[in-house]
Amino acid sequence: MHRFECVCLKGFAMSNRLPVTVLSGFLGAGKSTLLNHVLRNRDNLRVAVIVNDMSEINIDASEVQRNVSLNRAEEKLVEMSNGCICCTLREDLLEEVARLAEEGRFDYLLIESTGISEPLPVAETFTFRDELGRSLSDMARLDTMVTVVDGLNFLRDYQAADSLASRGETLGEEDERSISDLLIEQVEFADVLLLSKIDLISQHEREELIAILRSLNARAQIVPMVMGQVPLARILDTGLFDFDQAAQAPGWLQELRGEHVPETEEYGIAAMTWQARRPLHPQRFYEFIHKNWENGRLLRSKGFFWLASKYQEAGSWSQAGGMMRHGLAGRWWRFVPREQWPQDVDNTNAILKHWTAETGDCRQELVFIGQNIDVEKLSTALDACLLTDQEMGLGHMGWLRLPDPFGPWHEEAAA
């Protein structure tokens, strides 16, 4: 049975909007251990805790038996506009937060998401308004996005191509996410990464994992912890959250903007951006994607690509750990009538920023972050997938006749 638990620790009145920390992390990472630590060591803070659990209650009643009231509400699965099904609990969460804020008895609110939820939709919930015009942002302030990273199992889970369904954990029949998909979302959209179980790994393994996490999210603060013990000041009322900054935090985006991902020579972590202004041969690029990867450990790659056989369409590319996805991103603006372009200046300038007279906005733009990767070898392999001068001479109609093992694309861009 799905449950939505609210554990309220009694306190005094407060005047400002209720500051909120959202706690994410994969199943077994140590979220509940951290939560129990917070409940036992509140430093006189009056804290309200909302726990979203897909199964059983994770909090031992003996640890919250004093000054605690439990309030249950049915959980809802909400289909987001981007097609992802995520347990955002919009209506339920709005009701609970409104009640807690109106009581004025709490200094802080800590929301623990279920282990298979992504933090971004939860953050977006704070901008949602219900039919009465109410919004979480009217009564609460999203302060910190925290993700607990399993120091012992993260790399194993991240590199595996296992689906959540294979672990018996999904949000419904339509949930086709992989564990890698979930982990990268939780890491990239975080202000603070808490590294758990560091007592179970070596110093070298810990430092290597920290370097890898920093390459995936250079903005986040990384805090090692044992048995959930972390100073509350690192996760409560930090003032770290900024939606725009969080959306730009992923390492691949920073590399694409020229803000190089921190490189750690000791662990062989580096990043590269591959760009080109001629289309890819569909057969050669397909073979490149599907051959065994033998160039170090590819941690993360993302971007857009341009196939000759689908020259009007932009392809999307997203890889995290052992999972790779590609598909249709949309139509290149070059092939969209100008009257259908965005009318505002900012969006128009964003299009023209990548415009050339020869190809418009059509281009290859892929970012790779990896460990012990031969960058020159990778760049050479990608260059070999581009059309030759002779193939370029075939023109658009000739490109359409090139062998294309990708098959038809559908409206399902890579995540």
Give the positions of each predicted feature.
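Short, Lys/Arg-enriched N-terminal segments with co-localized hydrophobic residues
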Residues: 3-13
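C-terminal accessory "lid"/substrate-recognition subdomains
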Residues: 56, 154, 160-365, 375, ...
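Generic recognition of cysteine residues
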Residues: 6-8, 84-87, 362, 385
